[in-house]
Amino acid sequence: MLSTNLEQTLHRALAGAKRRRHEYATLEHLLLALLEDPDAVAVFHACGMDLEQLRDDVLEYIDNELSNLITTHSGDAKPTAGFQRVLQRVAIHVQSSGREELNGANVLVAMFWEQESHAVYLLQEQDMTRLDAVNYISHGIAKVTQVIDYARRHQHPLQRTLEKE
Protein backbone atom coordinates (compact mmCIF):
# COMPACT_ATOMS: atom_id res chain seq x y z
CA MET A 1 0.00 0.00 0.00
CA LEU A 2 1.21 3.50 -0.80
CA SER A 3 1.34 6.13 1.91
CA THR A 4 -0.81 9.18 1.28
CA ASN A 5 2.35 11.27 0.92
CA LEU A 6 3.75 8.89 -1.70
CA GLU A 7 0.48 8.89 -3.65
CA GLN A 8 0.67 12.69 -3.78
CA THR A 9 4.35 12.54 -4.75
CA LEU A 10 3.70 10.17 -7.66
CA HIS A 11 0.82 12.37 -8.78
CA ARG A 12 3.11 15.44 -8.67
CA ALA A 13 5.77 13.63 -10.71
CA LEU A 14 3.33 12.57 -13.42
CA ALA A 15 1.49 15.91 -13.41
CA GLY A 16 4.79 17.80 -13.61
CA ALA A 17 5.81 15.82 -16.67
CA LYS A 18 2.41 16.37 -18.27
CA ARG A 19 2.51 20.10 -17.49
CA ARG A 20 5.81 20.30 -19.39
CA ARG A 21 4.13 18.33 -22.19
CA HIS A 22 6.60 15.48 -21.69
CA GLU A 23 5.51 12.14 -23.07
CA TYR A 24 7.35 10.33 -20.28
CA ALA A 25 7.84 10.89 -16.57
CA THR A 26 11.47 10.17 -15.71
CA LEU A 27 13.36 9.59 -12.49
CA GLU A 28 14.23 13.27 -12.57
CA HIS A 29 10.52 14.14 -12.47
CA LEU A 30 10.20 11.73 -9.56
CA LEU A 31 13.19 13.25 -7.75
CA LEU A 32 11.71 16.73 -8.17
CA ALA A 33 8.43 15.51 -6.66
CA LEU A 34 10.29 13.83 -3.78
CA LEU A 35 11.63 17.25 -2.80
CA GLU A 36 8.12 17.95 -1.47
CA ASP A 37 7.54 14.53 0.12
CA PRO A 38 7.90 14.77 3.93
CA ASP A 39 9.38 11.27 4.28
CA ALA A 40 11.98 11.88 1.58
CA VAL A 41 12.72 15.41 2.83
CA ALA A 42 13.63 14.03 6.26
CA VAL A 43 16.14 11.70 4.59
CA PHE A 44 17.51 14.53 2.44
CA HIS A 45 18.08 16.61 5.56
CA ALA A 46 19.67 13.67 7.39
CA CYS A 47 22.09 13.27 4.50
CA GLY A 48 23.05 16.94 4.56
CA MET A 49 21.51 17.78 1.20
CA ASP A 50 21.11 21.36 0.01
CA LEU A 51 17.51 21.09 -1.18
CA GLU A 52 17.46 24.46 -2.92
CA GLN A 53 20.53 23.53 -4.96
CA LEU A 54 19.15 20.08 -5.71
CA ARG A 55 15.83 21.57 -6.87
CA ASP A 56 17.68 24.04 -9.12
CA ASP A 57 19.86 21.27 -10.57
CA VAL A 58 16.91 18.95 -11.24
CA LEU A 59 14.87 21.73 -12.85
CA GLU A 60 17.80 22.77 -15.02
CA TYR A 61 18.22 19.20 -16.21
CA ILE A 62 14.51 18.69 -16.88
CA ASP A 63 14.13 22.01 -18.68
CA ASN A 64 17.33 21.81 -20.74
CA GLU A 65 18.02 18.12 -21.31
CA LEU A 66 14.59 16.55 -21.60
CA SER A 67 13.20 18.71 -24.40
CA ASN A 68 13.20 15.61 -26.62
CA LEU A 69 10.34 14.28 -24.47
CA ILE A 70 8.00 17.11 -25.49
CA THR A 71 5.04 15.78 -27.42
CA THR A 72 2.06 17.24 -29.20
CA HIS A 73 -0.26 14.60 -27.71
CA SER A 74 -2.33 15.77 -24.79
CA GLY A 75 -2.43 12.45 -22.92
CA ASP A 76 -0.93 11.69 -19.54
CA ALA A 77 2.81 11.23 -19.19
CA LYS A 78 3.86 7.59 -18.97
CA PRO A 79 6.45 6.48 -16.40
CA THR A 80 9.74 5.39 -17.96
CA ALA A 81 11.08 1.87 -17.42
CA GLY A 82 13.46 3.25 -14.77
CA PHE A 83 10.60 4.97 -12.94
CA GLN A 84 8.62 1.71 -12.96
CA ARG A 85 11.63 -0.37 -11.83
CA VAL A 86 12.13 1.91 -8.82
CA LEU A 87 8.51 1.47 -7.74
CA GLN A 88 8.70 -2.30 -8.27
CA ARG A 89 11.87 -2.50 -6.16
CA VAL A 90 10.22 -0.53 -3.37
CA ALA A 91 7.14 -2.74 -3.41
CA ILE A 92 9.20 -5.94 -3.26
CA HIS A 93 11.48 -4.59 -0.53
CA VAL A 94 8.68 -3.32 1.68
CA GLN A 95 6.69 -6.52 1.24
CA SER A 96 9.68 -8.74 2.05
CA SER A 97 10.53 -6.66 5.12
CA GLY A 98 7.05 -7.17 6.55
CA ARG A 99 6.03 -3.53 6.37
CA GLU A 100 2.67 -2.54 5.02
CA GLU A 101 3.26 0.90 3.54
CA LEU A 102 5.55 2.32 0.88
CA ASN A 103 6.74 5.89 1.38
CA GLY A 104 8.94 8.50 -0.26
CA ALA A 105 11.97 7.53 1.82
CA ASN A 106 11.76 3.98 0.42
CA VAL A 107 11.52 5.36 -3.11
CA LEU A 108 14.57 7.53 -2.56
CA VAL A 109 16.64 4.50 -1.48
CA ALA A 110 15.42 2.45 -4.45
CA MET A 111 16.45 5.19 -6.89
CA PHE A 112 20.10 4.46 -6.15
CA TRP A 113 19.83 1.17 -8.05
CA GLU A 114 19.37 3.24 -11.22
CA GLN A 115 23.06 4.14 -11.41
CA GLU A 116 22.88 5.46 -14.97
CA SER A 117 20.21 8.05 -14.20
CA HIS A 118 20.93 11.74 -13.92
CA ALA A 119 18.75 11.82 -10.80
CA VAL A 120 21.20 9.55 -8.96
CA TYR A 121 24.12 11.55 -10.33
CA LEU A 122 22.63 14.72 -8.81
CA LEU A 123 22.23 13.01 -5.43
CA GLN A 124 25.81 11.77 -5.55
CA GLU A 125 27.02 15.25 -6.51
CA GLN A 126 26.09 16.30 -2.98
CA ASP A 127 27.76 13.20 -1.51
CA MET A 128 24.54 11.37 -0.74
CA THR A 129 24.75 7.60 -0.90
CA ARG A 130 22.25 4.79 -0.61
CA LEU A 131 23.96 3.75 2.62
CA ASP A 132 23.46 7.24 4.09
CA ALA A 133 19.73 7.00 3.41
CA VAL A 134 19.42 3.43 4.71
CA ASN A 135 21.34 4.28 7.89
CA TYR A 136 18.92 7.07 8.64
CA ILE A 137 15.74 5.17 7.78
CA SER A 138 16.73 1.95 9.55
CA HIS A 139 18.79 3.19 12.47
CA GLY A 140 18.14 6.91 12.84
CA ILE A 141 21.80 7.63 12.13
CA ALA A 142 22.02 10.98 10.39
CA LYS A 143 24.99 11.95 8.30
CA VAL A 144 24.70 15.36 9.91
CA THR A 145 23.77 15.74 13.56
CA GLN A 146 21.77 18.96 13.39
CA VAL A 147 19.11 17.17 11.39
CA ILE A 148 18.14 15.12 14.42
CA ASP A 149 17.10 18.29 16.20
CA TYR A 150 15.24 19.45 13.08
CA ALA A 151 13.30 16.20 12.78
CA ARG A 152 12.44 16.14 16.47
CA ARG A 153 11.20 19.73 16.37
CA HIS A 154 8.98 18.88 13.41
CA GLN A 155 7.90 15.56 14.96
CA HIS A 156 8.61 13.66 11.77
CA PRO A 157 7.37 10.03 11.71
CA LEU A 158 10.80 8.72 10.73
CA GLN A 159 11.99 9.80 14.16
CA ARG A 160 10.33 6.83 15.87
CA THR A 161 13.71 5.12 15.84
CA LEU A 162 15.31 7.97 17.75
CA GLU A 163 12.49 8.12 20.27
CA LYS A 164 13.23 4.53 21.29
CA GLU A 165 16.69 5.54 22.51
Over which residues does each language-model region extend?
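Histone-fold recognition with a strong bias for associated Lys/Arg-rich disordered tails
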Residues: 1-165
